[in-house]
Amino acid sequence: LDFRLEPRLKELYEQHKIRAQKIDWGYHEFLPWDKGMDFKRVPWDESQVTLPSGVITAIETALLTEVNLPWFTTYLSATFKGSLSVITDFIHTWTSEEDQHSNLLETYLLLTRSVNPKRLHELRKSVVEGGFEPDFHTPIEAMTYTTLQELAT
């Protein structure tokens, strides 16, 4: 990236951090903990699902997108290696935020018994095992993809 962008990128990153401080991404206050039941004691059954299938699909899709985080973070780090330090800082912050989103979505689905926990585990495992093979190769393509993925989820 052009070093002349660094002051503006630092400014944008600082603005992001200020906005992020006002949002508590700690999911402990958002989840219906009182609905939680031990799956060994009370096995999952399809009759326990209360969310519409479209909502479940949307949450699962967002979750599975976030699950690719280890691969995508590695890709971003390699793509921007040796770039501006603010980019590296942002990648680390973004990774932390995306991990929180993933944890929130998965925990919500399990607490509300909206999905078969074994099926969700297998889906998650399959996505991570599948890796991430981008078909783009430049920093601008990586930023474009990341922006679209962020807006979609």
Regions of interest found by a model, annotated:
Residues L1-T153:
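Non-heme di-metal
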